[in-house]
């Protein structure tokens, strides 16, 4: 039974819901979507599961729109607030239960956040009659154990806190730093090299399945010559992990959906200006000049530039609710070679 969205793929994957798997008509159109934390919960929210489910359901229209347009999709999500909460649970249970290492906490958040996105997106696709399955893959991401970043806590995670709370944590040996939004704890964040499960993810995506992978950047691992794959106590930036995944699965496009309209020169100042189209050279010049301002935009632009330099057609950065318009260049920032 052929439909206008694509051609049924023979057979059924293990665990399939029974839907006919649909291959999008243009096999070159593969996109990796990096979802910011605002897709899961509002910044000032309570953070309980009911609120996160409600916010996730309300945030998925852009992904449904991409699916309806026939894009092959891999989704990478952040987990900053959630991993911070889990680290606080470790501290609260000190003396009662053995603490879980950070790589295990990342895998745990990837599981339950993936479940939340998977269920919510599958329901939304079904409502629109889009015959695509959604699955979550717990993902390991290879890093270099000798990367200096494995020993230098620089990445903010968890919820913001007041200075008094931050100073108490600092006195206990927890690295903290003041950010624009407030005080945050810090953790080591090495650069990703490759996704261990990339071949499995690629096969699923090529079959038309929407894959949620590298959740929270994926669990960092390294290759021990004697033991094989071993975990590392750190986190990976989700935008950089998404960029690496895009190269591993040969995606043509990469989009980072966040809570700002795109890349601004002099962001946060009276002279800020939205930059709609950039070449890789122009984007690199902005990074070198420090013209993107303080905050989290520079790592996003670095990831976008790396994706295009590795052979991707284009990388986009824009507001979550404008998803399809960002990908099609009507709003946000697009970076090309």
Label each PLM-derived region with a short phrase.
Residues 1-21:
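N-terminal amphipathic/basic-hydrophobic helices that include classical n-h-c signal peptides
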Residues 18-337:
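C-terminal catalytic "cap/lid" subdomain
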